[in-house]
């Protein structure tokens, strides 16, 4: 069974082997050559579709965040094993959320800084992670106006919700997070 990389390599190999004959035909412009290459790759990919449709799993190379588990444990310790807002003490339903996203941190110290995170229930984490929720410097929960009242109620986000405490060191990261929330900056 051909693999994706093998099929592409075969296509490239066949295409590059034909380059002298294509040059002899006068087909040397980069646009025509690229068009031919793209057609060859598309044909190779099309030949893989039946095999790919029969498989329900793929093997991938993954770039994993080293330190994510340590960060989660630090969040569990700092927030005493419960949600920073609701107090929910069910670790399986809690997420270690970064105020300044892992990918946006410029150094490892920021990624692992306990003040760059909040232990949040899964529903709060989902909103916080996609910038539909944030927190004011005093810890008050801020929710985007695009989250309808009915959804807020269904998510249990009613009343005066706030972080159980806010350290001065949290405020820099909270300001960064709020700056990413387009609805707060309109």
Where in this protein do the model-derived segments appear?
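Mixed-charge, low-complexity interaction segments
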Residues: 1-42, 52, 138-142, 146, ...
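Charged, low-complexity, helix-prone segments enriched in Lys/Glu/Asp/Gln
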Residues: 26, 33, 37, 64, ...
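Residue-level detector of alpha-helix boundaries and kinks
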Residues: 29, 33, 59-60, 106, ...
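Short, charged surface segments at domain edges that flank catalytic/cofactor-binding sites
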Residues: 44-85, 102-114
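A detector for short metal-coordination/catalytic motifs
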Residues: 70, 88-91, 101-186
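The −1 position to Zn-ligating cysteines in a subset of zinc-ribbon hairpins
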Residues: 82, 95, 120
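Conserved active-site aspartate in kinases
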Residues: 98
């Amino acid at each position: 069974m051909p693999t994706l990389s093998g099929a592409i390599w075969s296509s490239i190999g066949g295409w590059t082997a034909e380059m002298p004959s294509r040059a002899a035909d006068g087909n040397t412009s980069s646009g025509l050559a690229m068009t031919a290459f793209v057609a060859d790759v598309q044909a190779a990919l099309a030949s893989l579709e039946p095999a790919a449709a029969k498989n329900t799993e793929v093997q991938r190379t993954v770039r994993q965040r080293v330190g994510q588990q340590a960060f989660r444990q630090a969040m569990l310790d700092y927030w005493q094993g419960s949600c920073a807002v609701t107090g929910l003490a069910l670790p399986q339903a809690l997420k270690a959320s970064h105020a300044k996203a892992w990918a946006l941190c410029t150094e490892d110290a920021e990624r692992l800084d306990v003040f760059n995170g909040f232990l949040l229930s899964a529903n709060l984490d989902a909103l916080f992670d996609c910038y539909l929720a944030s927190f004011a410097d005093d810890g008050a929960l801020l929710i985007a106006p695009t989250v309808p009242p009915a959804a807020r109620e269904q998510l249990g986000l009613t009343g005066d919700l706030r972080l159980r405490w806010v350290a001065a060191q949290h405020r820099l990261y909270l300001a960064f997070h709020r700056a990413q929330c387009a609805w707060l900056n309109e």
